[in-house]
């Protein structure tokens, strides 16, 4: 076997191990770190098949860095398929909507029906196609309504707005932003769509897409959770 083939095999093994490690970290909920971070509280992250990868993985690790235990919940406790959503920047035929591609996998460590929302200090609703059908889950609606009623901090990005909208969390003219094609989900459920990268209205912090994660979106969400903890 020549040197070139050996190098190629070695590179393949390294890449495979790297991807496996990333999947393990996501699937385990960063358990080792989280055991040390429980003093800051737990943040619930509902997901399902077709949850957007960037929407989800960045906050998963970012909030853990702030000392929070990020608990991934789903309809059942199993691995879920994430996807990548992107409008192709260079295409011979223009796209008017995002193209969907397969992404990583992430494990839900608790089912919606077993979630006790009073145990959590914050709720993070990510995007992708998953919210389109997750909003029909009665247990997820029960969970989301708890955060709305108790005025606990809620962060939402992109299509995640469909979940809080379905739970009645935008009634009374609450201001929020989202990806443009979800604007009606805000307006038709009593909210006010604001065409800005990120918006704050009380306990609700919203961002249009993951492209807006470079705003004070995360700092504000974390600040609100810390404020809530001392009340």
Q: Where on the chain are the PLM-derived regions?
A:
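Active-site-adjacent substrate-recognition loops and nearby beta-strands
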Residues: 179
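Short, thiol/selenol-centered motifs that function as redox-active sites or metal-ligating centers
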Residues: 157-160
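Extended, subdomain-level signal for the structured scaffold at the beginning of enzyme domains
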Residues: 31-150, 162-175, 183-231
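ADP-ribose/adenylate-binding Rossmann-like module
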Residues: 153-155
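Bacterial N-terminal signal peptides that target proteins for export
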Residues: 4-16
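Bacterial N-terminal signal peptides
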Residues: 15-26
